[in-house]
Amino acid sequence: MTRHHSAPRNLPRAQLYAERAFATLERFLHVEAVSGAVLLAAAAIALVWANSAFAHSYHALWHAPLSFRLGSYEFAQPLHFWINDALMTLFFLAVGMEIRREIHEGALSNFRQAALPLAAALGGVVAPALIYLAFNGQAPRSAGWAVPTATDIAFAVGVLALLGRAIPGNVRIFLLALAIIDDIIAVLIIAFFYSGGLDYSGFAVAALGIAIVLGLQRIGIGTAYAYVLPGAIVWTGLLMTGAHPTLAGVVLGLMTPVVPRRMREQPLEMMSRATRELAGWYQAQPAAESGAPTLPLRQLRVAQREILPPVVRVQAALHPWVAYAIMPLFALANAGVSLDGVDLAAGGSHWVMAGVAGALIVGKPAGVIAMSWLLVRLGWCRLPPGVTWGGIVLIGLLAGVGFTMSIFIAMLAFAGDANMLGAAKLGVLLGSLATAMLGLAWGAIYARRLRGASATRGTAQAPDSAHS
């Protein structure tokens, strides 16, 4: 049988440039330091915009109504609601999936491994809450006790990434585990303390959405698009209950499978067979143009999708949207505090600002370091390999970068008091910026010490190798 091989064609130069640019952009979007910088830039723009001559346009934009109509039914809410209560659900979905992965195979997969980050996280919640309450023990200021207890994963890890590879990998893993536990605690705080009176009829709607998700998983539906509608039902149900609807993201994230679904033919086998069929088809075809068979192409797409666990696949798809669209948009919509509009003398608002900032700068690092030291001192835990006390200090400082999550909790705590909300946001911005700068400064010292210790070990080993 005669085999026909079509001659390779040179790709157009424009296509080559486009492919290289896309590959560069894709690598760029997965650099954690870049996402932190984008988040910081969005917050800075919001702050400048809200205090400029165009401040009216800033507030008018976020209060502009956005509605959805279906027949005679209309659901209208300001743009601010759609960002904070709808888009942020995707952020919490990513958080839920990160928690699910860590419980399955990461730093939270066994208690012995998770004990020290868990204790550090608890210390990093209790200490700042107590420091805040020391400044603000009376209502309504006391409602903000949870504001400085949170850690912004993206911002904290982004700052750590700026320090480069001199920082041991286990420091990053410890910080991630601590921040994830912090997020779990923050979600529980939102659910129990900031959800208001609950209308239990909404739980039936949320339960229906969860049942549909379980049913789709049971029959082996792998495409993420099939879960959009039941996810929306869960979100609507939680909104009806009075609980914060973004918790739907956490629920769905924790339900996302961490292993590939079972198939009659394994993805690699399907991919190999479909590739052989396509190769045979191309060899059998003359140079004349004709469409490739659709079945092997469809099987290749399915195999490519199913070779990864759903939690990894969805997380990878969500990451650029969450890091470069949703979180910066949240910062842009919420970090714009009008300095003229905040009267720090009214109602003790200056104590709210001081309490939040002081709790993030002092309480968060102190709680993380003290609890870690206590458990190691008692012999209940050991520091992870490669992590020294200098690394724990760095983790404690970066845990004080509350930013996104702290602003989110502040908006729930002071929903009815714009002045105290503004003061709390100022405290979050000042505290987060201060701990980030302190973390960078200490991280540079810590990295230099590690390099010096490594060089000393290398010098000490050199004479030994010469004598051997």
Curated annotation (Swiss-Prot):
Annotated keywords: Antiport, Cell inner membrane, Cell membrane, Ion transport, Membrane, Sodium, Sodium transport, Transmembrane, Transmembrane helix, Transport
Residue ranges of the TM segments: 28-48, 79-99, 115-135, 143-163, 173-193, 196-216, 219-239, 240-260, 317-337, 356-376, 392-412, 426-446
GO molecular function, one term: sodium:proton antiporter activity
Compartments in which it is found: Cell inner membrane
Listed NCBIfam families: NhaA
Family: Belongs to the NhaA Na(+)/H(+) (TC 2.A.33) antiporter family.
Name assigned to this protein: Na(+)/H(+) antiporter NhaA
Organism: Bordetella petrii (strain ATCC BAA-461 / DSM 12804 / CCUG 43448)
Gene name as annotated: nhaA
